[in-house]
């Protein structure tokens, strides 16, 4: 099927399935987080605990023998022996990295180099290392060393007094990219061709020559790939065994080469690490055996002993070069998943996903069993990973979202510069592990699926079907209805995020003076005629006809502001700071002022003349004579007597969908294009022109009826910030809408039993009812 090649025989697959029968009604796709333990693996471990007396190894030599047996098993698993490597047990790979950071001897002028696409724990090493310079390397800068012949650089393999440490992951836990391990020897022999970007340089002088040591974070790699330490010999290897076996947790290891052991200088000592230590003087003597010097206190001996069942389980379920076969299996699944995802498209041809990887999925030596991606809408907008996590949870699919404790890979693949990172973490307040998934439409993380030896092809197919059913086959409001109806089934961390998934009211604008600039507001009260103060005033000419941008484009440069109880009008065209004000309240004086009549869309309207001061100001700014400002004085009803209107053309509210605006593809900033359509309400459904199918919708607590599409004229060709015309706006809409000049929808408010004065506010959720 596709490019999937089965690795296991039918009998082997049946045995594996029987061990993981508990997965019958769920799909587990987070093996990069941890793989799963087999049924008999934990049963055998429990039987051993019930059968044997396993006590503190400082008390019982039998326990010490068990622990040593596990050490030999670990060395055998990585194709090495005790003559080449020491095994130091730690709590996990992070603790192993810390051990190196704490004790590595940089000399007086050594450097610390780390790869950008690394686990957070590697970044944490920066706080402990005693190096005078700390550098960040990109993946490509590390790869530069792979083409360097031995002895080609200035740092070639003669001994130096200073020592530099280079840390990188054998496999990126974000993307699954595998670093070519041949680079290890090149760096050890020749140093680095490029030092990277200096992140913290206490000394500005030339770093000079140095011996180079490599610390390999193998936590992700070793879980599903064979690591041959006879072929590739890093100085330090960091491991977490739960990622390989699923059980037990709380035990990892630092493998230290004989070369690397010389550079780890122990300072602190705990129980079991010394031959003696005097309380009355500073004198002490560390144990001569390397691992005994570094394993402070009592080991987690029960967990260590239970690793034996892990090794046995792998050999029993995946016999014959277990890790080689697991590597082929997970890579085949990942390649199949990637190819199927790439084939998924919306009816308009837009891809469903954006994938994140460096080398594609053709070569197993470069790519592991991880697929990272983000889902996109038909308009190309990103779907937040929090939504994907919610949909997956309701389909009983366990996957991972976010940055996966690899913010450097996140930064690289999301193309986030320093300012964007500050906006996400400092200004917006995101923290690692939350569901803050989009910032101004850009993803702050991704969706990750990863595979283990017990993952089946149908598990991948279930993920793919979920994406088809939830994104290619239904509209967004149907999907969100599905989530909201089942929100209590979600984990608590996702329940709040799920309630925020609905599209929100993004922008709220009123146009106090008809055909003048918008006044954008965070919230607005609603009246019987629409938004408060929306189109209550209009400018008329000598003949009493309403002045619009069709006749005078400079109207868009008159910027209204509401300050206290005044409506201020500012002119943005000449850089002046002068303005004119009219009162917001209808005082007796205003009520007794001259009444005038005009027309809006062939309907007569009555208004109060706002006086000579504002009239003279308008004439001066617009360069026209005889202008007057009128304020609507009487109720006006739409045709059919259904709704009260202000001085709007046709309905109480005009709604525009940013997804539809985005589909026009104009080169100007999107916000400028949105402003051309002079809407009251801006939303973003992610699907262009979907709003034309709405019947009723709720915004916050307010119910609206759709009156129909807005038929456009050439006024939308005017840039509302400059007053310049660009006729391609109208022709583009006509082309996309098959000759129809429709863009945006008119809506009117339906009666509401709530007697409180309703209002709309940015952030209100949007619910499509029919």
From Swiss-Prot:
Residues 611-769 form the MOSC domain. InterPro entries: Aminotrans_V_dom, MoCF_Sase_C, MoCo_sulfurase, MOCOS_middle, PyrdxlP-dep_Trfase, PyrdxlP-dep_Trfase_major, PyrdxlP-dep_Trfase_small, Pyrv_Knase-like_insert_dom_sf. PROSITE patterns: MOSC (PS51340). Belongs to the class-V pyridoxal-phosphate-dependent aminotransferase family. MOCOS subfamily. The keyword Ligase does not apply. It holds the Pfam family Aminotran_5. It comes from the Eukaryota. The gene is mal. Keywords: Molybdenum cofactor biosynthesis, Phosphoprotein, Pyridoxal phosphate, Transferase. The active site is at 405. The lineage of its organism: Eukaryota, Metazoa, Ecdysozoa, Arthropoda, Hexapoda. Its EC number is 2.8.1.9. It comes from Drosophila grimshawi. It catalyses: Mo-molybdopterin + L-cysteine + AH2 = thio-Mo-molybdopterin + L-alanine + A + H2O. This is Molybdenum cofactor sulfurase. Pathway: Cofactor biosynthesis; molybdopterin biosynthesis.
């Amino acid at each position: 099927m596709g490019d999937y090649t089965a690795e296991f025989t039918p009998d082997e697959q049946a045995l594996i399935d029987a061990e993981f029968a508990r997965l019958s009604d769920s799909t587990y796709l987070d093996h990069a987080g941890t793989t799963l333990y087999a049924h008999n693996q934990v049963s055998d471990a429990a039987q051993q605990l019930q059968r044997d007396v396993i006590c503190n190894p400082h008390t019982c030599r039998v326990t010490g023998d068990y622990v040593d047996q596990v050490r030999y098993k670990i060395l055998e698993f990585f194709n090495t022996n005790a003559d080449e490597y020491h095994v130091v047990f730690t709590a996990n790979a992070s603790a192993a990295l810390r051990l190196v950071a704490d004790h590595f001897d940089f000399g007086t002028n050594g450097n610390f180099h780390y790869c950008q696409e690394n686990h957070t724990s590697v970044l944490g090493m920066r706080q402990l290392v005693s190096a005078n310079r700390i550098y960040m390397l990109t993946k490509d800068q590390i790869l530069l060393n792979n083409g360097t012949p031995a002895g080609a650089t200035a740092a070639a393999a003669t001994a130096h007094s200073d020592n530099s440490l280079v840390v990188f992951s054998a496999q990126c836990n974000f993307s699954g990219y595998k670093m070519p391990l041949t680079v290890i020897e090149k760096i050890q022999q020749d140093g680095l061709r490029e030092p990277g970007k200096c992140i913290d340089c206490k000394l500005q002088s030339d770093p000079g020559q140095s011996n180079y040591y490599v610390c390999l974070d193998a936590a992700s790699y070793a879980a599903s790939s064979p690591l041959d330490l006879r072929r590739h010999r890093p100085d330090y290897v960091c491991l977490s065994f739960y990622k390989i076996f699923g059980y037990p947790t709380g035990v990892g290891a630092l493998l230290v080469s004989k070369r690397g052991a010389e550079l780890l200088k122990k300072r602190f000592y705990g129980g079991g690490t010394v031959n003696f230590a005097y309380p009355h003087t500073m004198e002490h003597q560390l144990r001569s055996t390397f691992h005994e010097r570094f394993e402070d206190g009592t080991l987690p001996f029960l967990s260590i002993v239970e690793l034996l069942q892990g090794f046995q389980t792998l050999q029993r379920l995946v016999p014959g070069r277990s890790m080689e076969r697991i590597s082929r299996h997970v890579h085949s699944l990942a390649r199949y998943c990637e190819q199927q995802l790439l084939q998924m498209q919306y009816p308009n041809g837009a891809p469903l996903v954006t994938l994140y990887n460096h080398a594609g999925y053709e070569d197993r030596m470069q790519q592991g069993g991880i697929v990272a991606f983000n889902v996109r809408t038909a308009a190309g907008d990103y779907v937040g990973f929090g939504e994907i996590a919610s949909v997956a949870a309701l389909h009983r699919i366990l996957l991972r979202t976010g940055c996966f404790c690899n913010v450097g890979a996140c930064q690289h693949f999301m193309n986030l510069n320093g300012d964007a990172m500050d906006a996400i973490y400092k200004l917006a307040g995101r923290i690692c592990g939350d569901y803050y998934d989009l910032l101004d439409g850009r993803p702050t993380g991704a969706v990750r699926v990863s595979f283990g030896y017990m993952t089946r092809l149908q598990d991948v197919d279930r993920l793919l079907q979920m994406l088809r059913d939830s994104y290619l086959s239904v509209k967004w409001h149907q999907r969100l209805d599905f989530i909201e109806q089942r929100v209590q089934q979600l984990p608590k961390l996702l329940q709040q995020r799920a309630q925020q998934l609905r599209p929100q009211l993004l922008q709220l604008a009123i146009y106090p003076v008809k055909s003048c600039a918008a006044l954008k507001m965070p919230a607005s009260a609603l009246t019987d005629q629409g938004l408060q103060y929306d189109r209550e005033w209009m400018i008329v000419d000598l003949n009493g006809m309403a002045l619009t941008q069709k006749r005078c484009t400079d109207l868009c440069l008159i910027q209204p502001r509401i300050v206290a109880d005044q409506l201020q009008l500012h002119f943005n065209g000449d850089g002046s700071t002068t303005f004119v004000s009219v009162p917001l309240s209808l005082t007796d004086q205003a009520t007794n002022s001259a009444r005038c009549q005009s027309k809006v869309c062939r309907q007569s309207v009555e208004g109060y003349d706002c006086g000579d001061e504002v009239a003279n100001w308008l004439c001066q700014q617009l360069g026209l004579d005889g202008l007057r400002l009128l304020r609507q004085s009487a109720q006006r009803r739409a045709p059919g007597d259904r709704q009260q209107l202000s001085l709007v053309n046709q309905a109480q509210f005009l709604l525009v969908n940013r997804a539809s605006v985005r589909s026009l593809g104009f080169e100007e900033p999107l916000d400028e294009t949105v402003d051309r359509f002079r809407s009251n309400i801006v939303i973003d459904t992610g699907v262009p022109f979907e709003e034309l199918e709405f019947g009723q919708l709720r915004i916050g607590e307010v119910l609206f009826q759709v009156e129909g599409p807005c038929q456009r004229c050439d006024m939308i060709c005017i840039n509302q910030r400059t007053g310049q015309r660009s006729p391609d706006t109208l022709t583009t809409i006509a082309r996309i809408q098959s000759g129809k000049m429709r863009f945006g929808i008119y809506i009117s408010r339906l009666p509401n039993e709530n007697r409180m004065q309703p209002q709309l506010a940015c952030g209100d959720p949007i619910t499509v009812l029919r």
